[in-house]
Amino acid sequence: MVVASEIAKVASKTARDIAGCFTCQCGTQFDNVERIVQHFKECRYRDETCKDDDIVVYEPSSFVQDEKKDKPIIVEAASEATSEEACNSSKERQLPALSALSALSTLTTSANDDLWTARLIWQSTNDTKLDNSPSSNYTDLNHKLANYGLSILSIHALMCVECECLLNVIHTAQHMQIVHKLELNEDLLWFQELRTLKLKSPTNVLQTHSSQTHVYPYIRGLPVLLNGYECVPCTKNGTGFVHAIMDTFRHHVRRTHGKVIKLENCIRRTALQTVKNKYAQRCQFFKVDYVPLNGGEEEEEEEGEEKEDAQNIKERMVDFCFSKFMEKNQQRREQQDKGENKKRQDDVDQATDNNTNTILEDDEKDNDEEEEEEIVNAREKNLLNQQFNWTAIVKKLGENWDQLVRFEYTNGIVTLDTIVNQLIRYYYRGFRHLSGMTMGMRRMFTQGGSYSAQERGLCRLEQKDTVVRYAQSAALYLIFLLRRPSADSGIRRHLEAMCGATVERKEGGSNSSSNISNVANFDSAEDDNDNDNDNDRDSNNNNNNNNTNTDDDDKLAYLELHEALKLAFLQQYDFSKNVQDLEIMEFLACMSLHKDGTSKYAYEISACFAPLIYTCRLVAACELQRLIDEKQIDLLSIPSFQTAGSIAYAHVFCFITLGQRNLYDVLYETQKVVRDIIRTEGYANTLQGLSPSTVLFQPRSNSMYPCIGDAFNNMVRLDLSELTALYEGMFAKVQDLLKELCFDMNVEKLLPISLLRSIGDDINNSKLGYSFFKESIEIRSSHSVLLRTILKNSELCHRFFPSMSKKDLTKLFGGVSDQQRNECDNYSNHYNDNSNDNDNDVFLKLHWSKSAIKKYETKASIFNELLFCLVYISAGQPARAQEMVYWTLRNGKYKTRELYLMFGRLMIYSRYDKTRNMKFAEKPIPRFLSEPLSILALRYYVLVRPLEALMKYVTTADRSKVAVYLDFMFVIAGERLQRDLPYRIFPKATYQCIQKPLGFRNYRHIAHYFKEKNIEEEMTRESYFDLQAGHTRNTALYIYGRTMDNLHYLPSDYFANFFRASYKWQELLQIRDNPTHGLLVETKHPFIKRVDQLEEALNEKLARLVGEQMVEGDKEKDKTNEEKNKDEVKAEMTQPVVNQDSHDLQDQLATTPTAPTAFHYRPGLLQPSQTSVQHCCWALSQYYGLEAKFRSLKQFQSVYFSLLNRMNLITVLPTGGGKSLSFLIPALIEKKRQTPGKVMNMVTLVLVPMMSLRQDMMLRVNEKGLLVCSGNWTAFKDVRLTLETQLPDLFILTYESALTNSGLRFFESLATLGRLARVVIDEAHLLLTSGAWRTALSRASRLSGLYAPLHLLSATFPRQLEMVARQTFCTNFYVLRETSTARENIFYFLHPYDNTEFLLDLRTLMKRTKVFEGDGRAIIFCRTKKDVEYIHRRLHQSDLFAHTHVTIYTGDVSDEERQMNFDAFRNANGKTRIMIATKAFGLGINYMGVRLVVHYGLPASSMDYVQETGRAGRDGKYAIAALFYEKYDSTWSSYVEDSMKNFLNDNTMCVRSFLASEMDGECVCCASFANCVYCSRCSDSLLGEESTVSTMYGVKPTLPETPKPAIATHSRYNASFSSSPPPQPGNSSGMSAMNTNTTSTTPVSLSELSEITLFPSSVSPTWKKSFGNANTNLKYGLEDMSLSHRRGHKRTYDEHLNNVQQGVNHDMNRVHGSVGGMSGIVGIGIGIGDGDGDGDVDSRTIHFAEYKSRVQAVKKQWVDSTDISAQLERFFRVYKDECLSCTLGNPDTEIRAHTGKACPVRLSTCYKCGKADHNLRECKLRIRFQGLCLFCGLTKFEHADSDMAYTSDCRSWARKANLISLVYYAWNNVQYRRTIADKFLQGDVRD
């Protein structure tokens, strides 16, 4: 046999097919043929008898020819019997071996360097017995080789068990290092000694054991080619096909299975046996079922029963030994945590030593390590330097200022380490004091802070690391004071005494660590119900008894340190002293600058405050406890603790009170400034949202992961469906890995999914080492399953124990069984000697294969990486990396576990201490895994983790290495997941799955965006999604920040809400097989119910409508038109709005006419129904008494039109104008109209923006008791809705709670039943303009789909918003607007802000408006919460308001506290007269007694200004609206609108003129009103003096006193029409301000109305008498509306929009009370044709027509996004049988029916450019389509689910239509190129 010929043969056969590298029989590997040739010259195993001339090989030409025929190249050695003549005759075809190989190299390398390389490994099969006989010389050597996965066979050859191949003994070391990556180090010499063994090489084995017969189904002893291929379909069919050459295998698949099955679905790697066929001159391949050898000699077969008994004994012993192994690990962990006090002290000292030199770096990492790349924020540094002037402070300290904050300090006996250790002890003593305090007392240490409303008080620190870090920071400040020459000498004296006591205690021989353990024992697990720490307590008590001599020393050290801390932290400063001269500011300056004097980042500076503030509070708490212990104070004096002059105040609370210029106050105020400067970096520059399901994100630049696919300006496009694909891809990989790790065993049967719901978990159990794994017998008994499987399976046993036979294993475990039996007989000797545990450990006696363990550990590491990514993606809002790396499986000494079981899922309950800020407590956040991921993770932790721990133990023989597998959730390469690995793992995993490098930080931002756009939370203040993400709701809407909550004092539904949040996120990701089993969350219902159910409901509703009598209107109806309209609406409602999965429905929607087909009703010229007018007046009397009258015509029209339920309205009335009556009166009338026992009440839906407005409105409705209202619709979502279901009359809800998917479905069902009367949106301008409700606005258009009219209410609705409303709600509105927004009774006062005079001006204004008298109140509006606190503090400290109570109202205050403050403010008999609030209080709050509204700072917009000033003077009396502004706000402020800036800068502009032009589009001023209080711009008086105003303008500053009306009694008139005075009370010819003496508010019945005059002067029974003719109307200020609408005049919605855009005066379209031009009869009714009387047209027919138009408009919105694609698809379907290339090439010609490939226009032309002189590869046309499917040209969203997008098997309609080819052809056509270039390429027509 010739070595060179074998090399050539293998190379030629496998050159094109087998991937990998070629391995010579000597063990050397190659990656190209040149190296093989060079190696052949030097290889020592080259056959000496072989010469180059003896090698025969085909010529290169023959090689190429044979390659085309798919025949393997035959290279064989020349026979020894070959004659010389034969050789000479074939010389032309014979080449030397080296030349042949060179030719082969030239040919194959030029084709593809990667296709020819191969790896051939030789293996010995199961007849090669392991030479382990006792008489063998290799017995001991084999035991040692087994550790490396090597074995010497009986054929005297060396085999690698892991690779299953034969090795050359000389190259064994290289093989282990290169292939298995093992570090030999000291064993390298031992491997070199192996060369002396006389073992056979692979070539010698081949020569000895090869066969020459014809066919061999299985030959024992022949080599095996491991990288062979098996055909899966053929194997299933029973025929079977295997081969080693990929090309041959590929031809077989195409020839046998065609193109239906993909190649990757057919191929399977397998081990093949190669047999030389003598006659065919080629190798044949056979599949090998490898069965490892069991022993050196053939074993005698045992009897069945004996063999079964031996197997049972072995399994029982394996289980017993494994349980013993796990128990020893647990015992060692408990001993390490509990008993080893000295080790714990060493850990503390070591942590101190390690952290003292790197605290700044650690703080930097702790605060921002999760940020992948920090960007230098120069602006932030400049703001800090400008605010604090750090550079000037450190300049005073000298050039060596940086030495003052060094961590190395030793001065006599005072050392930094001693101070830190004693501070740790001090903290734990302080924690003990805190635990004895009551909640109220602990809260006293946090009062006055910005978070005081939410804090539960000063709390202990949870984590030991946090205690050490805080102690280091406090110690560093003490050292800084010691280095300062001006420091208090008492601090040094006390610290020296403390250190002296510490040294004396150590010299006395006492164990200081025991005392620390006693103090820190409080930090151990709490609620120890199992008494697991009793022994520790006893030992601690014994230690205390033995160390009684050191108690005095400990107490002395504590007292001395306490005194030093008091001098350092409990300090007060004089207000005259400059803050920059304080020691604490000098310390902060040194900590905040680099050595070169530049400022650090703001987050680095912010990290310094929490430890110092907390220490200051804790020292104060310890001082308070000292006073209590010394009985200087008692707990009965707590109310006087914060009273100046008390002992507690003088010694404790004066040092932690804000505004007292103490250290605490300085730290707090400085921290607030830093926080104001700090803003968490937004993601607008790295993330752009395109749609609710699509984003563009900017990945981190990395050459390893190039961007593939949709990329725009370095930003990558990501769709929500890709996240689903990412999860599914990762989950499939994890499933396969788990199957491999479990050796293909049936884990579903062993650990079924029902186990998740059957296992118990005691969440409150904090016992050391506890986890829910201990609660289940199934789990405990499953730990050893994989080990038993290895020992039972021969192949696995041979893989992991290659040098041990079954007989050896049975003998080993049998000996353990005998030993156990003996120990049971002699119980006294049962494991008394623990020192021999390692020697007697049975697992260490097994000869494990290190390479097999290494391979298993690698797979497990990959599994952990993918599991980490899956948890990060699917558990809800993503956690931070620093959280996840520390997640544990069981309770530890200082940290409880994070993995729990709840609701049948794995719950991760993480605690993250990064954002302590002013709370100082860990804030746990629950996250729930999906059910499939939960059971997969559970199976891994139960089955695989114990085996990993055992393997780690047998490789290291160190039990301490095992703890990481039993403690942490994610273990990579035998270690806990490191902090930097998530940023490398996640991009790699995502790139492998979706080819997009999604970074760790990218996904956090993307998940937040998708949540905001796609998931609606039915809550107002807090979202559990935001809590999972680690920030509040307000932060989520504006910036991306961090806050969390705490475990203690949580509500009972806390976990349920988080479970709901996680489930909704998993539902958004479309995770399969994720049921809730009826817990908490209902399954997501479809948008439209089943057609048959809807048909039944519609039939019932239509039957009721047909049989019901009309209450008002014309009795004669056109029944034919009515039935036609009803049938059309019924057909529309039975169809879903949109279904993206149905192409037919898209065709239907796209062809639906978008313009409304039905007529639009408009206000006509008819008289209103007198019955309806009587009902309106009766309802008004029920609310406000018999003499109450409507305030204005517009108010009455709003009520009347709302009652008719025929139109969509926009009502714009001034604040206090009675807008609420527009739905309260109709609701009351409808309630009285209902027939008892038949149809139940109608429901009115009212939407409000704020919780405060909802509470105020509900309070007012409930006080009257006329209607039933509810603020929570969810109480009725489980009720089956029928016509008889009892429901509230009003649903008053916030935008967020109503505009959700579930909420809209509920009200859609009400509308389908015909029980939804109207939808009212209060403060509608906020919904359309404010960004806080952007998510609700995205769903607002669905309100138009409800079968009910829309009614928008607002006091500030600019005219430009009318178009926005029409576009948002897809319908037309009729506008009712008062003539002026500005109020006549308000004095608008503008004044620049002066800090020194502000309080005096405020008091003067309060006196002028008589706020201090009666029920007068004042409101101060501020822009931010910071300003609210500032004003509150100034008023509290000022003597001017000493007897005035002040309260606050902000968004972050709890609901209970806000309600309490509001009740105190509106209490007429209360003392609270001033409310300081943000804009949240300026929306709809109704309190009549507000006399003064003050703006501290400029409002953001004119709408805000009108809303907030509208709180004043709502009873019609004199009031002042004062605006104090700064020049900066009017010039540079970015949040103030330009219109407000221009208004402030123009001192000549009247306030009412500005408001009228902004809100009403009119030009008026103060002089235009007949009776109003002039503004400060129109008056010479600065503060509105009475004499000045009365003298100059004849107007009294206080309007005439009127009794408090129920609704309002004055009216405004536009003086531009007439200068005559308004009509006086009693005159029925106008609508004047009436003095309505409300004598009775008792509701009256309809029968009593006959005795009472029901009609107000503004609405009389005779309309002609009330209004007169047009001239009368003009006289009294009524608009001439004769041109607005005439009979039969109709215009479509599109015409109306065109008129608006052309500037047509569309006041006529917004006014609905009109004057008859010819007859002079005024009508405020509704008419659309001829007729008269009460409703000349059927209202229900009109309603159906309007509803149909709105439904069509809503559908049009859904269709617009896919309109182009739908049109193209329909076009191609119509012309699918005709050639479109002919059409584009010559539109005038007739389209001929032929395929595109046969088109004569495109025949033999380039695919791209259409030219015939080159092919596609040579085309120079550079146009490419990015982000599209390369096979069809569609985007991912335009594909159907079954299209198999972005694959070669794409089945979309565009591929069938050859869309891409058609687009290229259109580009090459001159007629279309310009159009395409102008639309998409900015006019660029170049190729």
Curated annotation (Swiss-Prot):
One of its GO terms (biological process) is DNA repair. A motif (DEAH box) lies at residues 1322-1325. One of its GO terms (cellular component) is cytoplasm. Its EC number is 5.6.2.4. GO terms for molecular function: 3'-5' DNA helicase activity; ATP binding; ATP hydrolysis activity; DNA binding; zinc ion binding. A zinc finger (CCHC-type) spans 1804-1821. Residues 360-372, 524-533 have a biased composition (Acidic residues). Residues 1401-1559 form the Helicase C-terminal domain. It comes from the Eukaryota. SUPFAM superfamilies: P-loop containing nucleoside triphosphate hydrolases. Residues 329-347, 1112-1131 have a biased composition (Basic and acidic residues). Residues 1200-1375 form the Helicase ATP-binding domain. Residues 540-549, 1626-1642 have a biased composition (Low complexity). Pfam families: DEAD, Helicase_C. InterPro entries: DEAD/DEAH_box_helicase_dom, Helicase_ATP-bd, Helicase_C-like, P-loop_NTPase, Znf_CCHC. This is ATP-dependent DNA helicase tlh1.
